[in-house]
Swiss-Prot record:
Reactions catalysed: uridine(54) in tRNA + (6R)-5,10-methylene-5,6,7,8-tetrahydrofolate + NADH + H(+) = 5-methyluridine(54) in tRNA + (6S)-5,6,7,8-tetrahydrofolate + NAD(+); uridine(54) in tRNA + (6R)-5,10-methylene-5,6,7,8-tetrahydrofolate + NADPH + H(+) = 5-methyluridine(54) in tRNA + (6S)-5,6,7,8-tetrahydrofolate + NADP(+)
GO terms assigned for molecular function: flavin adenine dinucleotide binding; tRNA (uracil(54)-C5)-methyltransferase activity, 5,10-methylenetetrahydrofolate-dependent
Alphabetically ordered keywords of this record: Cytoplasm, FAD, Flavoprotein, Methyltransferase, NAD, NADP, Transferase, tRNA processing
Enzyme class: transferase
Claim: Methyltransferase is one of the keywords in the record: yes
Family, as annotated: Belongs to the MnmG family. TrmFO subfamily.
Entry function: Catalyzes the folate-dependent formation of 5-methyl-uridine at position 54 (M-5-U54) in all tRNAs.
UniProt-annotated location(s): Cytoplasm
GO cellular component: cytosol
Cofactor(s), by name: FAD
Pfam families: GIDA (PF01134)
Any one GO BP annotation for this protein: tRNA methylation
Name of the protein this chain belongs to: Methylenetetrahydrofolate--tRNA-(uracil-5-)-methyltransferase TrmFO
Amino acid sequence: MSQSYINVIGAGLAGSEAAYQIAKRGIPVKLYEMRGVKATPQHKTTHFAELVCSNSFRGDSLTNAVGLLKEELRRLDSIIMRAGEAHRVPAGGAMAVDREGYAKAVTAELEAHPLVEIIREEVTDIPSDAITVIATGPLTSDSLAEKIHALNGGAGFYFYDAAAPIVDKSTINMDRVYLKSRYDKGEAAYLNCPMTKEEFMAFHEALTTAEEAPLNAFEKEKYFEGCMPIEVMAKRGIKTMLYGPMKPVGLEYPDDYKGPRDGDFKTPYAVVQLRQDNAAGSLYNIVGFQTHLKWGEQKRVFQMIPGLEHAEFVRYGVMHRNSYMDSPKLLTQGFQSRANHRLFFAGQMTGVEGYVESAASGLVAGINAARLFKEEEPLVFPNTTAIGSLPYYITHADSKHFQPMNVNFGIIKELDGPRIRDKKERYEAIAKRALADLAAYLTV
């Protein structure tokens, strides 16, 4: 093919992963990132692969679909997984990272790579000079989004998601919280803020009546279930919170807890969990408390949480609009455009939802862009694997009802033979098959 490089637009998780996979295969990359010359509403730094919502890569067990996907990515030499592993922070059975250390590591490795040229500028049109991976994310600039939407017949999709507040640990009242992971799984990694029924009811009332930051009048409120604002969840009813981010099961009071409780109950009525957000352990985020409340309201309402009475918020929660494509119509399983075979898309804009899923899409798109450059057939991972099932799902879903999707065992091809009734055993069997099939596919 008569060209000497591949473009990658956007240095988020997907773009960073794509650029690395291309360069690893000996092909020069021009990696474009506008942060540094033009800010986005949500990013705080100019580092690559910045985490703008939670600092968690979610479950790490192979009986969890995202845990399986992470293991597959490790075996495929993912730069995102490698940097994440190097900057882990305690999170029980989950994988969480020091967001700044991790992002700096990804940035440094790509900046130092001899085949990666970093170009800090905004791209406003779809390049025609070379094979291109577009990974501009859900916060794609308006000018480029218009060009991408033109591929979609002008019909763009969107949803809103939000980020949770972060507090300074030194301002937490440690007499009202206790360190524990749910069911004592893994190390004790979460600060737990227990509530009595009276405290919970007062908190719920304050949350459901608090003032939200306004949306544009012409935009409907449309949320992705996995990142729903806590106030929207609260308005669905008390049980939604008690069976969701504030569920108390597995978080019994420690024997030495001296705070208020309901009678002799060993388990609180509700619990708010705080998760370590940086390696130093000086910052904690409020787990599951993505929010779109006005900042003053966040301070008022969230200081009702036991232990946070005088907490200082180093970052308030924010909400932003995310755009995504009609992937069932527009993309192949290799994340290649059906309309322009020299064009690939990756990341949340394709309808994959989550950090790990975005990295996975970037890995697949990057590998396939490199294979096109070398005039090789694209890789289509088997849908018995997590990394194969995700692109299969987003390219085979019903276009009329297509919405972003996290990886889960429900989208991975079922096992052959009689159904294994025990869920843990079934998931273990799916994971074992996935890793075996991935290894076999890569040796063909």
